[in-house]
């Protein structure tokens, strides 16, 4: 009977540990008051054409209908273009824009940073292979960008 209890306890522990990476990959959304600032009167727009052009070059549709980034075709010059786009976004004072501009900004910044971190570690089988340590899976908690003086992770942006 003792052996069955130990096996059951071990099974439960392994099951719970198996969910740990999933909990990290999908954190609970929490909005920071810091990012509630916006300018409803702003007529300024953010130029995402460099990102659009970059994606048009490197995103391919698979036979299964899923779009994928052709990481193996990206050169150092192409990555430099991506970094230039990211740098142009991080240089902006995002609080000065309307909400719709902010939304596009955060979505595009998140995606560009994600591709950039994959390129930094390429080749790899999964983004989860990018790790900060034993109990981390993926780059979501790495400080990847500084916006208005605030160092942010992909989790923060999400």
Protein language model features and the residues they cover:
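Interaction/scaffold regions that mediate signaling and macromolecular assembly across diverse proteins
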Residues: 26-158
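Bacterial N-terminal signal peptides
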Residues: 10-19
């Amino acid at each position: 009977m003792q052996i069955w209890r130990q096996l059951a306890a071990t099974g439960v522990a392994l099951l719970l540990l198996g969910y740990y990476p999933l909990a990290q990959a999908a954190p609970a959304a929490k909005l920071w008051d810091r990012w509630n600032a916006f300018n409803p009167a702003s007529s300024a727009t953010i130029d995402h054409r460099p990102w659009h052009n970059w994606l048009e070059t490197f995103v391919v549709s698979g036979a299964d209908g899923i779009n994928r980034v052709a990481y193996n075709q990206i050169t150092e010059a192409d990555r430099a273009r991506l970094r230039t786009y990211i740098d142009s976004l991080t240089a902006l004072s995002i609080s000065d824009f309307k909400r719709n501009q902010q939304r596009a900004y955060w979505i595009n910044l998140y995606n560009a940073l994600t591709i950039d971190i994959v390129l930094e570690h390429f080749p790899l089988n999964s983004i989860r292979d990018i790790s900060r340590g034993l109990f981390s899976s993926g780059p979501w908690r790495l400080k990847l960008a500084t916006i208005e003086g605030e160092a942010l992770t992909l989790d923060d942006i999400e």
